Amino acid sequence: MSSESLTVIVGLGKTGLSCAQFLAAKNQPFAVMDSREEPPEWENFIKTYPRVELIRGQFSEKLLNEAQEIILSPGVSLQEPLIAKQAAQGKSIIGDIELFARNVNKPIIAITGSNGKTTVTTVVGLMMKAAGRNVSVCGNIGEPVLEQITPEPDYYVLELSSFQLETTFSLRSQAATILNISEDHMNRYATLQDYLRAKQRIYTDCFIPIVNADEPEIWCHLPFNKKPLSFGLNNAADFSLAEHNQKTSIAYQGKILMPIQELKLNARHHLQNALAALALGTAAKIPIENMLHLLRDFSGIRHRCQWVRKYKEIDYYNDSKGTNVGATRAAIESLGQAAKGQLILIAGGQGKGADFSPLKDVVKRYVKQVILIGEDAPLLEKTLKEITVIKHADSMNEAVKRSTQAAKAGDIVLLSPACASFDMFTNYEHRGDVFTETVEAL
């Protein structure tokens, strides 16, 4: 195998396997390595590519040295010592999004942010379908991007994580946005500013930047070539909220579009998502009627502030996707404002090095009891114990039972962990499913 053209894929999950399939289809020489002894796709890989070198249980410096280019899976940090050493030597290190960007010519809508990106990506994709466009919704959502190149759609709507953006250099989008920023993945970034810089890469070579007017610190110093299109709940923006006939309505540049009461989801963070989706859709020239019709009918996504059931006049919400402090803060604030009573919060898991103190004010205002689970429950207790009643649970089943005992008619039980799930569950979906099943069994 010639090292002059050798590509080394680091990481053999879904993304790594999709990269292997893409390179194999192009007859590009490649090898694969993963530090795990049994990475998720290794059995599929060796059946399909029995003659391709696969190193498991370690990273091989010798193989990395031989590579002309390295494709890094998003789960592997650029700070991994052997990877950082290759980068310092000037080796090209890319991700699957970069490989995708080099090989597509169709318009791309690109979306990132700490919270709401899956919802906004989904909504924009549905808006395009409602307008009769053939669209592929992919990236950090659904199937890997490299599996969506053939057959090629009319449009791509991409959800992108900071990890994916770090290794992307050729993305040229019709419109792109950073929805918001709050602490997340601080186990991978030294500072919040480093995390923001990774996110800001989404605006490189973007034709129409879409910006959050409520968080100007994200974008105000960036050298945009074109005037941004903005959305915002609190500040003057192209897409905003306005009072009309004693009703709060969505407005575009001062023109009333529809009252928020017509939306099935009209809590504060849902409205921000709707405004962002409208701005992105406008940049993609989707007719406003199609977008408004879609928003009226949209009832949300599983595990994202999803209403589960009412039991003894207590409402139960599954926000298992609330894997960081910002997401949980937004969920507490939105549901707290709408609740007749108070909130009982189920939180905890792997905190990823986050600072939990931004939860203090909303917990003090809306939460009468917190049920803590998981690895970083002691850190959450240390932050919140002076503010509200703290209880602990060893399982989701116990957490739901304790929450139900603490709740009264009109209260809300909210699972929004502010943490990753891997200490107790397979992933956040598994955590949300266990919560939902437990609630439905009450």
From Swiss-Prot:
Gene3D superfamilies: Mur ligase, C-terminal domain, Mur-like, catalytic domain, NAD(P)-binding Rossmann-like Domain
Main location, first listed in the record: cytoplasm
Xref: SUPFAM superfamilies: MurCD N-terminal domain, MurD-like peptide ligases, catalytic domain, MurD-like peptide ligases, peptide-binding domain
Binding site for ATP: G113, S114, N115, G116, K117, T118, T119
Pathway per the UniProt entry: Cell wall biogenesis; peptidoglycan biosynthesis
Classification via InterPro entries: Mur-like_cat_sf, Mur_ligase_C, Mur_ligase_C_dom_sf, Mur_ligase_cen, MurD
Cell division in keyword set: yes
GO molecular function, one term: UDP-N-acetylmuramoylalanine-D-glutamate ligase activity
Subcellular location: Cytoplasm
Function of the molecule: Cell wall formation. Catalyzes the addition of glutamate to the nucleotide precursor UDP-N-acetylmuramoyl-L-alanine (UMA).
Protein family: Belongs to the MurCDEF family.
HAMAP family cross-referenced by the UniProt entry: MurD
Protein name per its UniProtKB record: UDP-N-acetylmuramoylalanine--D-glutamate ligase
